[in-house]
Amino acid sequence: MEQKIYNEYVEILKEELLPAMGCTEPIAVAYAAAVAVQALGEKPESVEVNVSANIIKNVKSVVVPCTGGLRGIGAAVCAGIVAGCPEKELEILEEITEEQKVEMKEMLDTMPMTIQESDKGYIFDIQIKVCAGEHSGYAEIAGFHTNVICVKKDDAIIHEKEYEEQGSSCVTDRSLLTVEKIVEFADCVDVADVEEVLQRQIDYNWAIAEEGMTGKWGAAIGKTLMEAYGNSVHNRAKAMAAAGSDARMNGCELPVVINSGSGNQGMTTSLPVIVYAKELNVSREMMLRALVVSNLITIHMKTGIGRLSAYCGAISAGCGAGAGICYLYGGRAYEISHVIVNAVAINSGVVCDGAKASCAAKIASAVEAGLLGLQMQKNGKQFYGGDGLVEKGVENTIRNIGELAKKGMRETDKTIIQIMTR
């Protein structure tokens, strides 16, 4: 593999596999609020919030961690104001005290706050203005969760950069990602170059999945799967991924390592691979290489889909998980390509109606599609070009899914948001 491409792939993993405390959209709102307060330089007396429709959708129903069970945009704003420390970015709420939780609740009940939909037309946009007396602080995040594009104190610009419409977090060229090159990279990568980010993903995501399986979180999809369908590796792979989401969507304070800006996607793409690696008793190095495959396949698919969409992000991550497990079984580019095509043909079209408890069930469905796609490939079965969205060549099919999500589901997204906010 060319050194330039090799280096870019390493960098992509480092850019995307970030730790985050809680569902990433409300955490991004909290982060923006903390940045705005830092610019103001004093405790705010009122807040004005303008966010894109997809932020409204993804923050409305999910529990903001470390808030004592509070939900919604207002709760996320108050959490960020009280927490401060914007330098922590997506881990901004990791050291909240009980006293601060009480302060958040009081602030939510008493702070004058307006929340409106942004008129900028961005898919991902968070604007927060905090005011005290005659002074104000302003912060805007656009495109992705930590992309602060503007900070102001009154009318004085502290920080400003041009917003790129594609909203990508990368400094790399994502067009370099292909299934064939991803598998080649997984085969040749010096594990030391990716070990830190992948081991953190294993540690964090496994811990929250175990918490989801043992604690009382949400609809307990992970537990339900285990009770109903037993201890097979197939079922455990689904259940552990779902259990992580059970905990995360319902306020668990454990961090996860995200993928493509999403903790649910980070867990979906990694936990099934870890379960199978343990079952197959493969070496740690082999597990890490399989996680390279699963993570990069998910990132590759999400690049065309976009960060936020009406298309459920877990579907891509389930494909990534199936690809990573195929790698564990000795599959390489040819076999993995068929797994991906099979999986997306099964489950594409599942909608995203925001972050909430039922995401865990969608994750289980996404992992099931990945595993069924794998079993089809192992049995010599496949879907062919012309079968719906499937087109000959895995890259063509991935492109079609991106087009469906980004273009075809725009009106679907609007309708979902209208239903959720009426």
Identify the role of each PLM range.
Residues 20-24, 51-58, 65, 142-146, ...:
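A structural signal for small-residue-enriched, beta-sheet-centric alpha/beta enzyme cores
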Residues 1-11, 43-56, 232-251, 283-301, ...:
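Acidic-glycine-rich active-site phosphate/pyrophosphate-binding loop
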Residues 108-251, 416-422:
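Signature of multi-pass transmembrane helix bundles
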Residues 36-39, 65, 276-289, 299-365, ...:
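Hydrophobic alpha-helical bundle architecture
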Residues 9-19, 55-63, 247-258, 298-308, ...:
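Glycine/charged-rich beta-loop-alpha catalytic/anionic-binding loops adjacent to active sites
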Residues 19-35, 254-271, 312-316:
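Conserved phosphate/anionic-ligand binding catalytic regions in large, soluble enzymes, centered on
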Residues 27-130:
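Early transmembrane hairpin of solute transport permeases
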Residues 43-47, 88-93, 115-116, 192-198, ...:
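Flexible, glycine/charged-enriched surface loops at secondary-structure junctions
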